[in-house]
């Protein structure tokens, strides 16, 4: 999945997309999936962001005895991926839920939400399918209804946010979720514009942003709509709140030796991931002790040095991988009763 630029199997699969960092994800998750059997026998993997199923198809083909629990909040994605993964249907449990629904998804699959999973993959952001479907409103380059819901069956739309939120709330989400320097100015223009005519399509919003953001910033800061569209999407879908709940649930679900890979596409997501996994990768014993106190050692080992980025070659083959930041961790000890 991606953030206003896209998704990565190299080369592109028959579904017209390339699942991002596929081979690196396999390098990291493979040892956990094959710890007991080279074919993945007895191993359980969660694809927390199924999308079009490119990553899942690779893992199911590579490990012919692997069991998969596949989550997605977008019913259309589940439908498409379900058809794509039909040859492996006897090894998959599909669950229509956000990625913070991991506990319920595991229960639905007949598994414990605690220490029962060997590999978990998060490919965050908006998917290529959602970007490319012109009626979803995710892409600022296409005039479309201002929807932006990843699950179009529930929740508020981006148009409702623009037309009903107060100036203060609009400025807050633009600043917090979009890291937009001109949040207050944009919010003022939105309030002024909607008093004349409510926002319904992306073109009207993009036009306002071109008028509002100074020309000098437009020349050097990328597309003027990028940050505002990101902020609206994060707000509409509750992405950061969902991620803050999902990361601890994913860590709790891993068995000893189990691994998780997170692929983020903007700094806010990556920051949440880092903030959640770092404390559980450190000792809780007082500094200076010559031994580790029982139950006080780190639960996890960080597998990446900082956040890894796509190589120049991958970016050339798949430009939508350019913003990706990958982090991974392995459970090395059971969680203490405390």
Swiss-Prot record:
EC number(s) on file: 2.1.1.199
Protein location: Cytoplasm
Catalyzed reactions: cytidine(1402) in 16S rRNA + S-adenosyl-L-methionine = N(4)-methylcytidine(1402) in 16S rRNA + S-adenosyl-L-homocysteine + H(+)
Region described as Disordered: spans on this chain: 277-298
Keyword presence, Nuclease: no
Residues annotated for S-adenosyl-L-methionine binding in this entry: 53-55, 72, 99, 123, 130
InterPro entries found in the cross-reference section: RsmH, SAM-dep_MeTrfase_MraW_recog, SAM-dependent_MTases_sf
Highest taxon in the source lineage: Bacteria
Function: Specifically methylates the N4 position of cytidine in position 1402 (C1402) of 16S rRNA.
Protein name in UniProt: Ribosomal RNA small subunit methyltransferase H
Organism encoding this protein: Rhodococcus opacus (strain B4)
Gene assigned in the entry: rsmH
């Amino acid at each position: 999945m991606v953030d206003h630029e896209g998704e990565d199997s190299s080369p592109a699969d028959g579904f017209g997309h390339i699942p991002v960092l596929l081979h690196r994800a396999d390098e990291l998750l493979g040892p956990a999936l094959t710890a007991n059997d080279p074919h993945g026998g007895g191993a359980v993997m969660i694809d927390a962001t199924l999308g079009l199923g490119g990553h899942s198809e690779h893992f199911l083909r590579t490990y012919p005895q692997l069991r998969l629990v596949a989550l997605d909040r977008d019913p259309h994605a589940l439908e498409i991926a379900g058809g794509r993964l039909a040859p492996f249907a006897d090894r998959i449990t599909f669950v229509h839920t956000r990625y913070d629904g991991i506990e319920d998804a595991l229960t639905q699959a007949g598994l414990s939400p605690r220490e029962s999973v060997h590999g978990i993959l998060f490919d965050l952001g908006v998917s290529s399918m959602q970007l490319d479907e012109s009626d979803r409103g995710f892409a600022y380059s296409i005039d479309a209804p201002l929807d932006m819901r990843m699950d179009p069956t529930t929740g508020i739309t981006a148009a409702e946010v623009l037309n009903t939120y107060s100036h203060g709330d609009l400025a807050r989400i633009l600043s917090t979720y979009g890291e937009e320097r001109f949040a207050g100015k944009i919010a003022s223009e939105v309030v002024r514009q909607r008093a004349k005519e409510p926002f319904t399509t992306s073109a009207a919003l993009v036009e306002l942003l071109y008028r509002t953001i100074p020309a000098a910033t437009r020349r050097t800061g990328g597309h003027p709509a990028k940050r505002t569209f990101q902020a609206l999407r994060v707000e509409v879908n509750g992405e950061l709140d969902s991620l803050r709940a999902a990361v601890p649930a994913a860590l709790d679900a891993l068995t000893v030796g189990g691994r998780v890979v997170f692929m983020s596409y903007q700094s806010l997501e990556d920051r949440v991931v880092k903030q959640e996994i770092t404390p559980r990768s450190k000792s809780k014993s007082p500094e200076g002790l010559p031994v580790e106190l029982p139950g006080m050692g780190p639960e996890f080992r960080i597998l990446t040095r900082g956040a890894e980025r796509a190589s120049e070659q991958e970016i050339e083959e798949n430009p939508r991988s350019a913003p990706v930041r990958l982090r991974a961790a392995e459970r090395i000890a059971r969680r203490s009763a405390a």
